[in-house]
Amino acid sequence: MIRTLLYWGMMLWGWAAQAQYTITGRVVDSATQEPLSRASIFCQGTTLGTTTDLDGYFQLSLRNGGYDLTISYAGYQPQVLRVQESVNLPVALVKKDNALAEVVIKSSNEVADGWEKYGDFFQRHFIGESNMAKTCAIRNPAALRFLFYKKSNRLKVVADEPLQLVHPALGYEIRYQLDSFVYYYNTQYFLYRGYSFYTELAGEDSMQSVWKRNRRTAYDGSRLQFMHNYYDSTLEENGWVIDLLNENSDTKFSKIDPYDTTYYVVIDSTEEIEIDFPRKISVTYKKKTPAPEYLRSMKLPKGTPYQISYIDLKYSIVIRPNGYFYNQSDWVQQGYWVWKNVGDQLPTDYEPD
């Protein structure tokens, strides 16, 4: 009987891992109801996307999990919808106000030669400083606008159009819609918000092998792997340790069981898990040492054995089977993962062998 139950458990797990659902819909102009042909439909942070046909219809099959689906068309305001099951979506896009778009308001804080002054600084913090990240380049830097605020001593960067990045080390072209990047010089704290879409580069078999190896290197120890392992209940065997900041302490942490129901809940009806921590946690990855570039950047000793990141959750987060989690704005990180930026990130639909 036990063997039978185990067998069926494995069958159900396998079915869930392979399950798919389909998003269909039609994209039209909100005012005229005319179809919008070749509108872009894509899941943020993935390689999954399509376009509408001549009549505005689309269909997109997705692997089990949650996604933020973006629908966009030139000259129209984009829509973002969260999807996690089969659904038909009637989408009406609203035209941008061309009259307002033509009025360019020159901010007194804008830096005229911003790319020359801050381009390298921006790339180090937005793309990253690892050897992998250094191969990633922005093709359209003219889309960036740099604003410096003297009173608060902060730099803000915005983009007039999606950034076009090419990443030859990982084998992707990346379209990144940058909402904003802000760096606070007084505290050396920075954040950026936006969303990306990945397209795989074409290459010979030898190049595909290099990309496969590099992608696996980028995956090991990443936040994406952490989410996959947390969902699959395989944190410990994959080298992860979670410690919780002690009460009434600013520095001392104690190891916890991440699957204790104090912090972890399985939502059976939706195949989701919910996690929450009352205080800051440290996340240690014990299967890789920190990159030498990171140690130099942070002025840490060469013998530092593990990669450590620190997480504050504003509220609980929910993790879907594909590693997607929400709300992402409730996750604030420090430490190693902060050093790993766009140039070290993989699409969330990446699957290791």
Predicted regions mapped to residue ranges:
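A short, solvent-exposed loop/turn motif at the edges and junctions
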Residues: C43, T70-L81
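Structured interaction patches on ligand/partner-binding surfaces of diverse proteins
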Residues: T50, Q77-L89
